[in-house]
C-alpha cells in the first residue's frame, strides 16, 4: 500500500485498484470488505483515538439508481441513533465544490465480525437469544420511523466480541408509504420473504421473515432456502413449509397465481422435523431458554402468509426473547426523518448529486455550530459527528471473534475479525 500527500488536510492511500483520499486524522488504512456499493477500510482515528471503518461509495453518481441509494443511505444514517444500528461518525468529501464533487466517504463504528462468521460458531441459547433480541430492537427502531430495511442478511449484521450487535447498510432501506408494491429483487435471494418473491405488496414484517431465515441458519449452520433464482427460491420455501392455502392464493396477481397453483403441491414438514432437538444447544439453566421456545419463535417468523406472521413487538415479547427486554432499547424514541418523500423522489443524476452535497455541507455546518457533540471543528469539506461515538471497545484490543477464511467476504460492512470465541452476553 503506497501513500502520498495531496494537500494539507488529506492523505492518499492506494487500496487495491481504488484510491482513498481521506483526512489526515485517519491513519493506517487496511481493506476489510468490498461489494457493489463500495470498499471499506479499517483505520485509526487519531482525533477520537479509536478504530473506525471508512466506506468509500463506489461511483455514487454512475446512474440514478446508485445516486438515489447513496442519498437514501446518507440521510437515514444521519437520522438514526440506536445502539443496535451502526453509528455514523463522519461524512466527508475531498472535493471543494459541487462541480468537482465525485467521492463520498462515510465513517462508521468498526465492529469485529459479521453473522456469516458467527453462524459457524457453537452458540448457546443465551448468545443466540441475545443476538436475536438486539436484531429485533434495531428493526423495531427502524420500523418506528416507517423504515423497512429490506436487505437483512448475515453479512449486513455485525457484532463485537462482547456479543453487541448492530445492523448496517441502508442503501436499500425504504420509508414505508401508502404503496408497498416494489421490485422483488431488493433483498438477497436467500432471505427474501414470499411476498417479495411473488411481487405482492409488503409491509414492515417483511424484515421478520429475514430474521427467521437468519435464526434458522444459526440453528442449522447453513442457508435454509438456497434458491438459484426467484422461482427456485419459491420452490425451496414450499418444499419445506408446504404449499399455502387457497386464502393466500387469492391475494396473488392473476398471472402469478396461475403459476403458483400449477406448481406441485407440497405438504411441507413440521418444525419439529425441520429443526429437531439435536440441532440445538443444550437447554439453558440460567435463563430457562429451550429448543422448544426457539423452534416456536421460528415457526411464527417463517410464515408464508405475511398477515399471519409474527410482528416485531410480539417477537420481542416471546419467551425466547423477552428475558433481555429493556424498554430503553426496545422502545427508544423513533428517529425523525426530515425528508418525508425520501423514496418518492425522482431526480436526474446531477440533482441527486446536489442533494447529497447539500447533506455533506449540512453535516459540516452542524459540526461548526456544535449541534454534533464532542467533535472538533471540521477541516475543509470534512464533517465529524461524535453524537454516536459509543463506548464500545476499540478494535485494537484483542478480539475474541472467530473467523473462517473459507467464508465469503463481508459486503460493504464495517468489521474487522480475528480468531477466538464470542464473548458473554450482558
Swiss-Prot record:
Disulfide topology: none
Swiss-Prot/TrEMBL cofactor(s): Mg(2+)
EC number: 2.7.11.24
InterPro entries xref list: Kinase-like_dom_sf (IPR011009), MAP_kinase (IPR050117), MAP_kinase_CS (IPR003527), MAPK_JNK (IPR008351), Prot_kinase_dom (IPR000719), Ser/Thr_kinase_AS (IPR008271)
SMART domains recorded: S_TKc
Protein origin, superkingdom: Eukaryota
Residue spans of biased composition, Polar residues class: 405-420
TM ranges: none
Modified residue annotations for Phosphothreonine: 183
Regulation of catalytic or functional activity: Activated by threonine and tyrosine phosphorylation, potentially by the dual-specificity kinase, MKK7. Indirectly activated by Wnt5a.
MF annotations from Gene Ontology: ATP binding; JUN kinase activity; protein serine kinase activity; protein serine/threonine kinase activity
Residue ranges annotated as motif TXY: 183-185
Predominant localisation class: cytoplasm
Record function comment: Responds to activation by environmental stress and pro-inflammatory cytokines by phosphorylating a number of transcription factors, and thus regulating transcriptional activity. Regulates morphogenic cell movements, controlling convergent extension during gastrulation. May play a role in the regulation of the circadian clock.
Family: Belongs to the protein kinase superfamily. CMGC Ser/Thr protein kinase family. MAP kinase subfamily.
Identification of the protein by name: Mitogen-activated protein kinase 8
Source organism of the structure: Xenopus laevis (African clawed frog)
Amino acid at each position: 500500500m503506497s501513500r502520498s500527500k495531496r494537500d494539507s488536510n488529506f492523505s492518499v492511500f492506494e487500496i487495491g485498484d481504488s484510491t482513498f483520499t481521506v483526512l489526515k486524522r485517519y491513519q493506517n488504512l487496511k481493506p476489510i470488505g468490498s461489494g457493489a456499493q463500495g470498499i471499506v477500510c479499517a483505520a485509526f482515528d487519531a482525533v477520537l483515538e479509536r478504530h473506525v471503518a471508512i466506506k468509500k461509495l463506489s461511483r455514487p453518481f454512475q446512474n440514478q439508481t446508485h445516486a438515489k441509494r447513496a442519498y437514501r443511505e446518507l440521510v437515514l444514517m444521519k437520522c438514526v441513533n440506536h445502539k443496535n444500528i451502526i453509528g455514523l461518525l463522519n461524512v466527508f468529501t475531498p472535493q471543494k465544490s459541487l462541480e468537482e464533487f465525485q467521492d463520498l466517504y462515510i465513517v462508521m463504528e468498526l465492529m469485529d465480525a459479521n453473522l456469516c462468521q458467527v453462524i459457524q460458531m457453537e452458540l448457546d441459547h443465551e448468545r443466540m437469544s441475545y443476538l436475536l433480541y438486539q436484531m429485533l430492537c434495531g428493526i423495531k427502531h427502524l420500523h418506528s420511523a416507517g423504515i423497512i430495511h429490506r436487505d437483512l442478511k448475515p453479512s449486513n449484521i455485525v457484532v463485537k466480541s462482547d456479543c453487541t450487535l448492530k445492523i448496517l447498510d441502508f442503501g436499500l432501506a425504504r420509508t414505508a408509504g401508502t404503496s408497498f408494491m416494489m421490485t422483488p429483487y431488493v433483498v438477497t435471494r436467500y432471505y427474501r420473504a414470499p411476498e417479495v418473491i411473488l411481487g405482492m405488496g409488503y409491509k414492515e414484517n417483511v424484515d421478520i421473515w429475514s430474521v427467521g431465515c437468519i435464526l434458522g441458519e444459526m440453528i442449522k449452520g447453513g442457508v435454509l432456502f438456497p434458491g438459484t433464482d426467484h422461482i427456485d427460491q419459491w420452490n425451496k420455501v414450499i418444499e419445506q413449509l408446504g404449499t399455502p392455502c387457497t386464502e393466500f392464493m387469492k391475494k396473488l396477481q392473476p398471472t402469478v397465481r396461475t403459476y403458483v397453483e400449477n406448481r406441485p403441491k407440497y405438504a411441507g414438514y413440521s418444525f419439529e422435523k425441520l429443526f429437531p432437538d439435536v440441532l440445538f444447544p443444550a437447554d439453558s439453566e440460567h435463563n430457562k431458554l429451550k429448543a422448544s421456545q426457539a423452534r416456536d419463535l421460528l415457526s411464527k417468523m417463517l410464515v408464508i402468509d405475511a398477515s399471519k406472521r409474527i410482528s416485531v413487538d410480539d417477537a420481542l415479547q416471546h419467551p425466547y426473547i423477552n428475558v433481555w427486554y429493556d424498554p430503553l432499547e426496545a422502545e427508544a424514541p423513533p428517529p425523525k426523518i426530515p425528508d418525508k418523500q425520501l423514496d418518492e423522489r425522482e431526480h436526474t443524476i446531477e440533482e441527486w448529486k446536489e442533494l447529497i452535497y447539500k447533506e455533506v455541507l449540512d453535516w459540516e455546518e452542524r459540526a461548526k455550530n456544535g449541534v454534533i457533540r464532542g467533535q472538533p471543528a471540521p477541516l475543509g469539506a470534512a464533517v465529524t459527528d461524535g453524537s454516536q461515538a459509543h463506548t464500545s471497545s476499540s478494535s485494537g484490543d484483542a478480539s475474541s471473534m472467530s473467523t473462517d477464511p473459507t467464508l465469503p467476504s463481508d459486503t460493504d460492512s464495517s468489521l474487522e475479525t480475528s480468531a477466538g470465541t464470542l464473548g458473554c452476553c450482558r
